[in-house]
Every structure is written in C-alpha cells, then in structure tokens.
Amino acid sequence: MSKKREHHKLFMVGSDAPFQFTEAYKSLRTNLEFLAATSDCKTILITSSVPGEGKSNVAVNLAITLADSGKRVVLVDCDMRKSTISRYLHIPRDHIGITNTITGKDRTQLANALVNFKDLGIVVLPVGTIPPNPSELLATKAMESTFAALKQVYDYIIVDTPPGSVVT
C-alpha cells in the first residue's frame, strides 16, 4: 500500500483496535464528560495545525467513543476544502450535507442530509456540495441555526474542521 493511500486509512476504536488505543479514547471521553458537566459544553471542535495530523481520525473515534457510553452524537464535517470524514465512512460524494442545508437550496432538508451509522452509534452530517467560499459559509446565521437545531437533538456535536494553516 502506498504512503498516500495508507494516510487515508481510518483506524477505529472497537473490538479489533489495540487496548491502549481504545483506552486513550475512553480517557478522553471521561475528561470531556467531566468538563461538560461543569460548563455545559457539548459542541467539540477538532482541528490541527497542518494537514495530515489525524484530526478526522480523532473526530470519528471520539464520536464513536461518546456514543458507546449511550450519548446521542452527531459528527459534523466542516472541512469543506478536503472532506475526509465522507471518505473514511464511505459516504457518496453527491450526498447532500451541511453546505446544502445552509446555502438555501435544501435548508429544510437537514434530516435528509444526516447519515445514520447504527453499527457505530453515530449520525454524520457530511459536507455536501463544496462551495466556492467555504470559510465565509462557516460564519453565517444559517450555520448558527443548523447547530442550534442539532443541539436540540444530540448530546454531543463533534465538528471536524480544516487545519488552521489552511483556512483563510
């Protein structure tokens, strides 16, 4: 397997994962639950400084680990330049997503954009159609409304974002 191909392979918590790997995510989950209990912080943004540091892998595994404890978890892919979540989880590129729900065309279709992974215990809101202005789209009222709607349904919202060095 080539280096480039190997880079995009997802290593997930579960029965096949090494004990230490799974325990590290359980420890992270416990720490976040303690923090959430005192601050009511239920939206967790995952980022990195540069591409290739594993932020999408962390986002997926954190979402699964939180769901394993009985929490309702939605994983939102906001990496609109280079979506890795959809590739990891084999969500078709043409599936509607957050961009479609906030740009006006399919705003009422949030429920249709969500992809339920019952085997993993999580729901994913993929990117959708890649917009010409991704960073501007993240700061809209429609985005705020979408997150408000998700907060009504889910215990945790895990947000996968682009690396800090990529966003302009």
Which residue ranges define each predicted feature?
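P-loop NTP-binding module
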Residues: 1-168
